[in-house]
C-alpha cells in the first residue's frame, strides 16, 4: 500500500502547537490550528501533527521539544503571549531551546510605542510581553500588542503567535513574508467530488486501487447515514513540483472515480 | 504562583487523540476534540493534551504510546475506524499496546447484523471494521456501522470512536454509561463575567492576586481590540468534592472581580 509520506515528501513537514486550557476543556474550538494548517498546506507543507497543551511551562516546553525532535521544517504555535499570569509560551519555548528568557529590546520598543502613542503607561504586565527566548526575533503584530516570537533553531523555522485569531493571522503573514527560510517548492492541489447513493464501503475497493495506481491521496468523507441515505465527499489531493502534472493526474483520477460511481448507481452533486 | 495542577488534581487527567489528515490540513475544524473535551470536563476530568495525527499506523501508534506513558486515567480518540484503506486506528492502537490485530467475533456479529437486516452483502472492506486489538471490547454504535473499541490497559480506560460526529457522540455515551471504570468524584463548575472598557493588561494584576488568594482558575479571554475598544470574557472555574464549596468560592471571586472592574471604569455586559 502506498503511504501518504511518499506522496507528500515529508521533508517539507510542519507541526502546529496550540497553547490554552480553553481548547482542552472544549470551551473553544481550535480554529487557530485549522487556519495555520490551511496556510501551511497552501505553501506546500504537510502538517503532520497538531498538539494542544495547557498553559503550563513544562507542558509547553515538552510540546516544543518533542516537535523539534521530530525535525519538521516549520513549527507554528498560537496562544500564551499575552500580559496575564497564565501566558507562558515565551518561557516554555525558552526552556525547550535551553536558553534564557530575557527582555528583548526590539520587542520592548514595539510595545512601548503602541502604549505611548495612546498615552497608556507601561506596567510590569505590559512589559512582560517583551520577554523572549535569547536570540529570538520579534515579529510585528499589526492587530494587537504582543509581538510574535521567531527563532531559527536546528534548521527549523519556529514561530509563536498570539491566541487572538486576528492577531495570529497577522503575525503569521508577517512571518511568512519576512522570515520563513524553509520554503517548499512543491505545489499542492486538491479537487472534490460529491456523490449521493454510494456507501463509503462500496467505493472503498475502487479508491484503494486508484491510490495504488496513481500514487495520489484520495479520501472519502461520509456526510450522512452510511446505509439509509449515503452522501460522500471525495477529496483528491496531490502535490509535486509541476502544477500541470498534478492537475492532469487529478483529472485522470476523477475520470476513473466518476466511472466507478456510475457503476454503483451513484448520483453526482454539485456541492454538499 | 499557584499552578493549575493543584486546583484540578491531575490524578483525574485525560487525553484526546484525533486521527485524520483533514484536521491537519485545516480542511476540517476539530469539533470532535471540543465535544470530547467538554464531555470529559463535565465528568470531572482535566484534559491535559489533544494530539491530532495523520492516518498512518506509526503516527497513530506513537500518539497512543506517548499518551499511555503520561499515565492519564482516560484516553479517547476519534477517527480512523471506517471501511476504507486509510482507516488505521485499530491497527495503530494494537501496535501501541503490543498486541495483535484480530477479528473480534462480537464486533463482527454487530456489523453483520446491520448489513444483513438491510440485505447488503458483507465485503472485505465491511469486515475490516470488526478487526480490533486482542482483548478489546466493541462498543455499540447506534448511529452507524463501525463499533467503538474499548481497551482497559495499565489502569487507563482507552476508547476509540469513529470520526463522524454523530457516531462519535453516540459511542462516547455508550462507553461512559457501560464501560468507564475511572470515575472522578470531582465536581466542576464555572462562571463568566463579560466586561467592556477594561484592558486585559489592566485587569492582570488583580487576576494574579485572586488566583493566589483563592486557589482558583481565572482566565481572561480578549474578544476585541485591547486598546481602542476592549471587551473581555472572564472565566472563573473550580473543581472539588463539594459542589457548594466551589459555588461559594466562585461567588466570592466574582464579587472581588466586579469590585476591581468598577475601579477600572469597566462596564458589565450580560453577554458577549
Swiss-Prot record, chains A, B:
Family membership: Belongs to the CinA family.
According to its UniProt entry, this protein's organism is Saccharolobus solfataricus (strain ATCC 35092 / DSM 1617 / JCM 11322 / P2) (Sulfolobus solfataricus)
Identify the NCBIfam families for this entry.
PRK01215.1
Which InterPro entries does the record cross-reference, listed alphabetically? Answer: CinA, CinA_Arc, MoaB/Mog-like_dom_sf, MoaB/Mog_dom
Q: Name one Pfam family in it.
A: MoCF_biosynth
Gene3D superfamilies from the xrefs? MoaB/Mog-like domain (3.40.980.10)
**The protein, known as:** Protein SSO0103
Amino acid at each position: 500500500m502506498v503511504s501518504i509520506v511518499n506522496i507528500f515528501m515529508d521533508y517539507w513537514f510542519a507541526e502546529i502547537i496550540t497553547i490554552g486550557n480553553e481548547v482542552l476543556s472544549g470551551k473553544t474550538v481550535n480554529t487557530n490550528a485549522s487556519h495555520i494548517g490551511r496556510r501551511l498546506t497552501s505553501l506546500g507543507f504537510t502538517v503532520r501533527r497538531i498538539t494542544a497543551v495547557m498553559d503550563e511551562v513544562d507542558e509547553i516546553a515538552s510540546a516544543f521539544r518533542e516537535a523539534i525532535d521530530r525535525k519538521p521544517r516549520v513549527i507554528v504555535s498560537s496562544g500564551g503571549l499575552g500580559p496575564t499570569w497564565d501566558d507562558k509560551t515565551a518561557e516554555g519555548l525558552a526552556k525547550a531551546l535551553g536558553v534564557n528568557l530575557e527582555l528583548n529590546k526590539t520587542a520592548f520598543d514595539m510595545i512601548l510605542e503602541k502604549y505611548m502613542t495612546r498615552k497608556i503607561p507601561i506596567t510590569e504586565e505590559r512589559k512582560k510581553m517583551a520577554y523572549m527566548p535569547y536570540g529570538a526575533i520579534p515579529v510585528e503584530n499589526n492587530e494587537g500588542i504582543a509581538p510574535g516570537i521567531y527563532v531559527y533553531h536546528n534548521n527549523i523555522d519556529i514561530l509563536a503567535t498570539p491566541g487572538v485569531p486576528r492577531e495570529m493571522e497577522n503575525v503569521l503573514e508577517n512571518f511568512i513574508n519576512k522570515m520563513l527560510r524553509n520554503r517548499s517548492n512543491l505545489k499542492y492541489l486538491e479537487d472534490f467530488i460529491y456523490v449521493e447513493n454510494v456507501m463509503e464501503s462500496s467505493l472503498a475497493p475502487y479508491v484503494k486501487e486508484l491510490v495504488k495506481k496513481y500514487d495520489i491521496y484520495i479520501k472519502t468523507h461520509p456526510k450522512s447515514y452510511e446505509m439509509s441515505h449515503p452522501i460522500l465527499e471525495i477529496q483528491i489531493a496531490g502535490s509535486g513540483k509541476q502544477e500541470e502534472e498534478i492537475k492532469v493526474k487529478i483529472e485522470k483520477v476523477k475520470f476513473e472515480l466518476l466511472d466507478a460511481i456510475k457503476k454503483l448507481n451513484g448520483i453526482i452533486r454539485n456541492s454538499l
